Curated annotation (Swiss-Prot):
<keyword id="KW-0336">GPI-anchor</keyword>
<feature type="signal peptide">
    <location>
        <begin position="1"/>
        <end position="26"/>
    </location>
</feature>
<feature type="domain" description="UPAR/Ly6">
    <location>
        <begin position="27"/>
        <end position="118"/>
    </location>
</feature>
<feature type="disulfide bond">
    <location>
        <begin position="46"/>
        <end position="74"/>
    </location>
</feature>
<feature type="propeptide" description="Removed in mature form">
    <location>
        <begin position="106"/>
        <end position="134"/>
    </location>
</feature>
<keyword id="KW-0732">Signal</keyword>
<feature type="disulfide bond">
    <location>
        <begin position="29"/>
        <end position="53"/>
    </location>
</feature>
<dbReference type="InterPro" id="IPR051445">
    <property type="entry name" value="LY6H/LY6L_nAChR_modulators"/>
</dbReference>
<feature type="lipid moiety-binding region" description="GPI-anchor amidated asparagine">
    <location>
        <position position="105"/>
    </location>
</feature>
<dbReference type="Pfam" id="PF00021">
    <property type="entry name" value="UPAR_LY6"/>
</dbReference>
<feature type="disulfide bond">
    <location>
        <begin position="78"/>
        <end position="98"/>
    </location>
</feature>
<keyword id="KW-0325">Glycoprotein</keyword>
<dbReference type="InterPro" id="IPR016054">
    <property type="entry name" value="LY6_UPA_recep-like"/>
</dbReference>
<keyword id="KW-0472">Membrane</keyword>
<dbReference type="GO" id="GO:0009897">
    <property type="term" value="C:external side of plasma membrane"/>
</dbReference>
<feature type="disulfide bond">
    <location>
        <begin position="32"/>
        <end position="41"/>
    </location>
</feature>
<keyword id="KW-0449">Lipoprotein</keyword>
């Protein structure tokens, strides 16, 4: 597989996160989707006061190639996590960090963070399979 497949996998994961996400109000969060990890993100006010700011760091490994992107956004819940997952033979690691304070999702903290959202990966697998057949 080449970097095109890596990019498609990352985009699909991020698209699913966006489709599954409702925004929260009142909380101020950083907001960017599928950008390189060193990229600065804009801020946004979330629609519901009980929302979470979420930071995702997504790494897709195809053969010996690694690709990382980050997403920062508002979600109504903190996503459930697992350890590591494989989608169509590719290793996908998603570090997730959730918080409930203004602008607390600047980055996924190093060490001790959780990995891989189960729902996102399930929907991503379906999306990848659908895209394969289209």
């Amino acid at each position: 597989m080449d970097t095109c497949h890596i990019a498609k996998s990352c985009v699909l994961i991020l698209l699913v996160v966006l489709l599954c996400a409702e925004r929260a109000q009142g909380l101020e969060c950083y907001n960017c989707i599928g950008v390189p990890p060193e990229t600065s993100c804009n801020t946004t006010t979330c629609p519901f006061s009980d929302g979470f700011c979420v930071a995702l760091e997504i790494e897709v490994i195809v053969d010996s190639h690694r690709s990382k992107v980050k997403s920062n956004l508002c979600l109504p819940i903190c996503p459930t996590t697992l350890d590591n997952t494989e989608i169509t033979g590719n290793a996908v690691n998603v570090k997730t960090y959730c918080c409930k304070e203004d602008l607390c999702n600047a980055a996924v903290p190093t060490g001790g963070s959780s990995w891989t959202m189960a729902g996102v990966l399930l929907f991503s697998l379906v999306s990848v399979l659908l895209q394969t057949f289209l």
